[in-house]
Amino acid sequence: MVRSTAHAARRPEPGGTAGGRVEAGGSGSAAGPRPGRGPGLVACHVIAWRNADSRYPFLWEEGVGSQPAARWHAEGEGPVQYLSDTPDGAWAEFLRHEDIRDPEELSYVRRSLWAVDIGSEHLASAELPAETLTGDAGSYSACREEARRHRSAGSSGLMARSAALMPGAAGGWRVDAGLQPGAERDGQTIVLFGGRPDLTGWRAVFEGRPDVTLLAAVRFLS
């Protein structure tokens, strides 16, 4: 996730708040000073990333089409929105599910990448073993039950380790005498329950593809 203001607080870690919840953007969502924070500080919004077919919107809508079942929802439980905390994570989700492993096949990809302001969502933390969070379709049942548990408790969504990225593969890059790998960290998937007409997105890429080097960072289904 990317903070959309320059005065953001440190990124919260998954499960970093009491009660198994993750604050995705701090305690306020308005772009103005927070009470008790002092002058010159502003609330920060959180940018998440969504990969989508360029012919369609970046989120699923209520009553528009039938969303296929996926890790965190069964058939008929949508809409559920799936986003990633990094652009690489969003691309990896697509590559994993389409089983694109060949660099030559990658050259034909034309997809949109959206930057989505998810504000200050207070997300539940998925409390499942790593092998369940990152497993194949056989692990989906347990993940769906976990999503139902949080949804019935009133959560607007949850955050979980990315199933599509290998461990440590969400580190990105930094510039120091040229491009250097960033510090290793695990990617996160952001799951939002229901239609979300309140969210704003920007098309960062209209018809593009990821760098071929990302293929080595993808955890494929088999």
Where are these regions (language model features)?
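Active-site and NAD+-binding cores of ADP-ribose-processing enzymes
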Residues: V2-R3, E13-G15, G19-E75, H97-S222
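An N-terminal RHG(E/S)-centered segment typical of histidine phosphatases
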Residues: R10
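A short, exposed loop/beta-hairpin motif centered on an aromatic-Gly-Thr core
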Residues: E75-D85
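A short, charged, amphipathic alpha-helix used as a generic interaction element across diverse proteins
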Residues: T86-P87, W91-H97
